[in-house]
Amino acid sequence: MAGINGAGPSGAYFVGHTDPEPASGGAHGSSSGASSSNSPRLPAPPDAPASQARDRREMLLRARPLSRQTREWVAQGMPPTAEAGVPIRPQESAEAAAPQARAEERHTPEADAAASHVRTEGGRTPQALAGTSPRHTGAVPHANRIVQQLVDAGADLAGINTMIDNAMRRHAIALPSRTVQSILIEHFPHLLAGELISGSELATAFRAALRREVRQQEASAPPRTAARSSVRTPERSTVPPTSTESSSGSNQRTLLGRFAGLMTPNQRRPSSASNASASQRPVDRSPPRVNQVPTGANRVVMRNHGNNEADAALQGLAQQGVDMEDLRAALERHILHRRPIPMDIAYALQGVGIAPSIDTGESLMENPLMNLSVALHRALGPRPARAQAPRPAVPVAPATVSRRPDSARATRLQVIPAREDYENNVAYGVRLLSLNPGAGVRETVAAFVNNRYERQAVVADIRAALNLSKQFNKLRTVSKADAASNKPGFKDLADHPDDATQCLFGEELSLTSSVQQVIGLAGKATDMSESYSREANKDLVFMDMKKLAQFLAGKPEHPMTRETLNAENIAKYAFRIVP
């Protein structure tokens, strides 16, 4: 039957072949039913006898060279030409269509139900017949629900998308807030093991849905206009969101909610259609997140709340078996020198609900890691002074020996103590300079940095830290009594050994210490001719200026407002505490 493949829903034969015999109710069950061209006849009209349709169907089912489209047409009962012109999906094999044809011959209710089931099964794909669903079946709706949860929680979808891209490129990433993590872990239990960047169906569908939503948000974002209401309103901050991004939009629409928002820096309202249509006035309702430091009793309440959370987190970490000294060193390295926290400690911090990273746009004052570091120093106390025998200096080559200046680590340092775990190159270099009076910066750095190109960067950072520390004596002064009246007040370690003021970077402060430069850092700059004023400068945050210099060496940003802070303008923010 060379021409049988030409049969199908269109009811046509091979080009140029026609059936010279009219369709009739004669015997078509034998081989005489085919024309001399051996091509099947046109489908019978709807009012043709049922026996004719059965005979034609039996004939076609016995033909082996049937195409898949023809077998589907047969399984559907060979509908008329006009109905069969609808596009048809690929069907199962001819063996799956044969039971349907035999079932129609019996004309019993059970057979009719079975035939209907076969016709229903005929609309499925080969993957469905094999018992497997197509790719992403159910994964796309699931991924869309996850994205909607993030939108409802007010998450920064663009930031999450950037985090995923960085993770897939094996770059360093900043983990999202606890709210976002809880949503993602609900759907990706192995999130921390990299499930979000895996090739699973749900992860792939989620990344695609997230990118679509980010593009839609960018396309639908209204352009900023210069028109403003008569009341001056602050501009929206570009600071990325933090763990407080999950606060609901309904709180923002109430007076109490907006007041609470003022007390929570870096809070961003959720981007939803309801918020966009809430007001037609061109007023930006987000309070400014930059240069905003909580004042008065509110800041005391926030600090007490942070201390309580930090104490509870320390108990949880101790129950997990985390070494407290290792934790203190890891926190100091991360806060001061921006070095990543080790993975085992990071997982432990995740277990107690603390994100193991500090957002680059976030104030250190409200970060849980900072509260944890202060609580840890309070619990462990100052580090015991270790008596170390000074290592002998590297011998200097004789002057008569000809050598290139950088061909060896020649140094005249007399004291080179062991390096602490929490010290980076800048901190260690500054300590070596203090232990070796008269030594130069380049000479000191050459004693412990081998790479000559890295050496140049370390020298520049150390000089920046030293220049900042030299500004200490030029700062405006605040008496110890006035500092004590601050909220929270300054408490010298010599006077309050059990409740001394902690440095922003962890250590207890004392004016009698020979290695500390105690200052109060204001949140707002004022002219050098003005004395300290709580109304103008805001409340002070007390710290060691040497630690602040190390913090600013790599990235000169104000730890609270993220404005530029360096040796040129430190005197406008800092006040020296005097007895």
From Swiss-Prot:
According to its UniProt record, this protein's enzyme class is: transferase
Q: What is its EC number?
A: 2.3.2.-
Assigned protein family = Belongs to the HopAB family.
- Which cell locations does it reside in? Secreted
**Organism listed in the record:** Pseudomonas syringae pv. tomato
Under the subunit heading, UniProt states: Interacts physically with plant cell Pto.
Q: Any idea what job this protein has?
A: Effector protein involved in gene-for-gene resistance in tomato plants. It is recognized by the host Pto resistance protein and elicits Pto and Prf-dependent hypersensitive response (HR) and programmed cell death (PCD), resulting in host immunity. In susceptible plants, acts as a virulence factor by suppressing PCD and HR-based plant immunity. This function requires its E3 ubiquitin ligase activity probably by recruiting E2 enzymes and transferring ubiquitin molecules to cellular proteins involved in regulation of PCD and targeting them for degradation.
Q: How is it modified after translation?
A: Auto-ubiquitinated.
Q: Mainly resides where?
A: secreted
Q: Which residue intervals make up region (Disordered)?
A: 1-140, 214-294, 384-408
Keywords, sorted A to Z: Hypersensitive response elicitation, Secreted, Transferase, Ubl conjugation, Ubl conjugation pathway, Virulence
The miscellaneous comment for this protein is: Unlike many effector proteins, it is widely conserved among diverse genera of plant pathogens including Xanthomonas, Erwinia and many strains of Pseudomonas.
Q: Where on the tree of life does the source sit, at the highest rank? A: Bacteria
Instruction: Spell out the protein name for this chain.
Output: Effector protein HopAB3
A biological process from GO: symbiont-mediated perturbation of host programmed cell death
> Bias regions of kind Low complexity — which residues?
23-39, 89-101, 219-248, 266-281, 384-402
Q: Where is this region: E3 ubiquitin-protein ligase?
A: 337-579
Host recognition: region residues = 1-336
Disulfide-linked positions: none
